């Protein structure tokens, strides 16, 4: 994000409030990446908004405080076969990337479903949880700026939802929180 993104969001919400009193300007601190997050970043965000006299409508949501909710959704996806456990190391993934590039394979997915045959490795070495994307379909979203955007699923990576330590990635946390917060308009910086 940034102050420009906050201003755009704030202006859009203020206009929307004139037509629909249910619109809210929400503030969420997305701090699931501990290496890139610290208290000073949060302080800077709050001070910047205060300096501009921009007030959020509800309590601040801190993503790292919603760890259990994010893990719950990942485990639900595992249970319902919408995700899988992956034991691939970075070196294995790099070899797959090189192979795909050399052989001009367009499928972005580097990690196939590997949990069935590797139960011992899952227990001893740990695993990440990845989203399971099926090749045979397309995904379409409606974007305010670009209109209808359709992507072949084979071009979407089986991205990580939970890291080896069980912590959620941004890709999981942001979607769960958007859903739980009732977000229906997203403008990101």
Which ranges hold each PLM region?
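N-terminal Rossmann-like or analogous alpha/beta NTP/dinucleotide-binding catalytic cores
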Residues: 1-102
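Active-site cores that bind ATP or allylic diphosphates and position pyrophosphate for catalysis
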Residues: 63, 79-189
